Amino acid sequence: MNDCLRCQLAESRLKRDWNAVPGKGSKTAPIVLVSDAPIKAESINREPMAGYYGMVLDRVLKAVPLDRNLLWIDNLCKCVPLDEKGKFRSAYVDDEVKKCLPYFDQTMEEIKPKIIVALGDAALKFLSGNRKMNIRKNHGQLYWSEKYKCHLMGVFHPKVILAEYEFIKYMVQDFKKIKEFLEKGETKPTDVNYVFARDKQLLNQVLDQLSKQTEFVYDIETTGLNFLTDKILCIGFSWGEYSG
């Protein structure tokens, strides 16, 4: 991997005598944690989630608790992405990550995990194939990856916890969901029959449907984590299993 010259990141890696960062963990791991790209500490140590990031991860795993031996830890991009001034940046999805992706794909073929956990916004956007994904809004939600034939969940990256430590509670909550998922052994989720009320006529149909129910549930999606102050994106209703 250190001989890789597939993209422009190889030049900065060789110039600084840094390393490409391989994945690490158990090749029988049911859980794969993956970030978009490594940082300097990971490149020097040739180990993903090294340094302070690893300390945050260990604290989260201890709080759950979840055994580290159940994890394979990796990066979509194997080299440290730097800007023109030599400062760390996120990997470019359309170039650097795509050229590096065969390494990750091969590893997933070998491991065949039950769930891939995307650490941070960039990794979640790429693995889900949805640029509109937002880690603050979509963290902890379970999706299905047709490409990797396993489930996918996004969680906060440890760098977010280092900047805003109170967010560690959300990371712990999400990892508890992952543990629960493994214990229950859920299968691919059934498609939900959604009706989207984008105009007045459809809205009236939905309201008419709701008025006939003895009970229903609802969920409010907002632009952030504080539903009391953030703007409302949509209000979802369900009046039966796999309907909304």
Predicted segments, located by residue:
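Conserved RNase H-like, two-metal-ion catalytic cores of nucleic-acid enzymes
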Residues: A41-E42, R46-P48, Y52, L57, ...
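A polyanion-binding, active-site-adjacent surface
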Residues: M1-E186
